[in-house]
Each structure stands twice: as C-alpha cells, then as structure tokens.
C-alpha cells in the first residue's frame, strides 16, 4: 500500500491506497469527484484530464503515488460560488458539447492550452486538443467554444 | 493492472541498487508508455522505481558547444525551451509533435530513448544528430545505441542520465503522424553535421535506421530534388493494419524530401 497526500482543489487529502491506484480512480473512488470521467482504457480519450501542478495530464495514465505531494485541479474547482468559469461559460454559449461525456476533460485541456497560448489560431486549437476525443464528433462547436473561451479570458484579464 | 510495489527513488544510485536487487523491477519516469502497457496487462513488473522527479536527471543546458538534456526532461519542456529553440530548432519542433499535450506534459526524453519504440520521434533526432546517450555507466554513441525494435545497448541496471546533442549546421524533421495515436507512420530527421549529412528514419522499419543513399545524395546537394528517384527498400519495413510496407516506403521518400526542402530554406 502507498500512503499519498494530494492537494485536490485546494484541500489536502491523505489516503492509504494500493500502489497501482490510478489518479483517476483516486479522484473518483476515494474522493467522490466523479466529474473526472473515464472514457477509455487505453489513454486515448482525454476525458479524465485534470491539472497536476498546473499542467494538463490524463489522470488515467498517472499513478496516485506519482501525484503524492502534488497540487491537482479537477473540473469541480472550475465554477466558483455558482458562477461558471469562463471556459464553461463559453462551452455553454457555443453549445460545445453533444452528449457531454468528454466535456470535463475538454475543459481541463482547454484550460491548459490557453494558459500556454492565450490566443490560439484554429490550427493551434486542433493541435492543442489532440489528446481529447469527442465520440459525438462535436468538434466544430468545441473549437468555437475554445475561441470564445480565449476571448472571455482575455477580457477578464484586462 | 497486476499488482506491483511503487518505490520513489531518492537518488540515481539508489535506483541502480534497487534494480540490481530486484531483477523484475522497472524504471518509471513519465509513464506515458509504461502505464498504458501495465493497464493492458502486457507487463508484470514486481516494482516500479520512480525516477521522474530526480534532480540529477533534470535540466537543459549548452555545454562545450553541445546541447545536454537531462533524461527526465518532459517533452513540453524541450518543445518550449528557448535554449533548444536557439541551438537545435528542429529538436524543439520534433518534441512538440510527440503524442498530444497531455503526453508531452509527462513523457520524458530518457523514457522515449530507453523504450526505443520503432515509431517514436526522439530516436530519429538522437540518431540523426549523432548524439550520445550518457548513462550511469558510460557514454554510448547513437550509432551503437539503437538495436532494433524496443532493443537498445542498455544493460538492465543501466539508467540514462542525459542525452548530449552536438549542434548541427542545419537540421529538419518531417513526420507523417498516425492520425489517432500521433506516432510516426514515417518520420525523417536530416542533419548537416560536422561529420557530414545524416538521415535517420523512424516509424517505417522495425527500429530507427540511417538511410545512407539519401545521406550521400544530400551531401553534394541539400535539396528535395537530390532525392528524386531514391527509395528505401520496402522489403524490410513494417506492415500492419495502418499501412502496407510499400506505402511506408513511399512515405519515407516523401518525408525525406520535405525535411530536405525545409533545410534548404534555412
């Protein structure tokens, strides 16, 4: 068993887990944070994307033990006091989803993309979302939502 | 996943000693190949020895006209490093094409080079630039290091510490990625080095290899046209659900021309 202490959405959580526990399972099963979705078993879909120490990672491809001592941010931390995060707002406005299953991972990946590149071109958005799959193929509106997210975030920074 | 014990190594020395004592232990750095492999139950290590956070394996620096990159350096760090972009822009470009952003945020150069996946990108740069693989035991020249599919000169207890790239005069990489996985269906790295032109091909064969005919042709004329009529033999290339070996042979020629054209523009 591995003893891990991980800060998730600002709160420290210490747990004793099996060494093979994936971060995604830690978040969902230990902490009940089921906004982090598991959409595949092959590290391809990106539904489980969260931020670890400020970088977007697939939480199904990282052990909880590797994240010991890390700062993790999940979709649950995006909205504050009932107000959507600008990226969530943009996905709502642009209808950047169909079934919604991939949306939490998309939003966490977009947060990572826009941190590195606050004003991406369409080409850069495609490149930045290569790790996320939408099985409904709702990509057109997702790309629109990313552009709108960038606008909203830039507006907020001003 | 099968059960294993997770061990966070406190030093390179400790990791080496642990490997020596536990023959079924495996090193873990970024885990971007290893963890999916474990999830698919394709491997059953007794222990995972995590070396991803060791300071001894970190850092990107220019030393004596060479670019040294620590083994645990993540792909996004190489892709975004001003030092790499200035010294070997083709290497930063290559790092930004690996996998996807989430993979680049965790995956490491040492892990990629140690794993030597036949469709990985870094082996093309390491072989194309004639780099050296510095390990806990010795320095291995790229020409001796890569030994075919997932095979390298590393012995089981040896750990890669850093990769040292001599600076080329000019270099370029062109890749045809598999649209789903991002792995190279064919990737060609061309470098004009102090020792002459080197052309390394990944993704197409059972392991990264040098295309000597192309090297000879580009030595006298660095242009896409110099490669006209040249082709790699399809016989030794990979064939799978994604492409026939003839298709891959054609991709190699096309990617080589694209890389040569990029160099000629510089």
Give the label of every model feature segment.
Chain B
Residues 1-266:
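C-terminal structural segment of proteins
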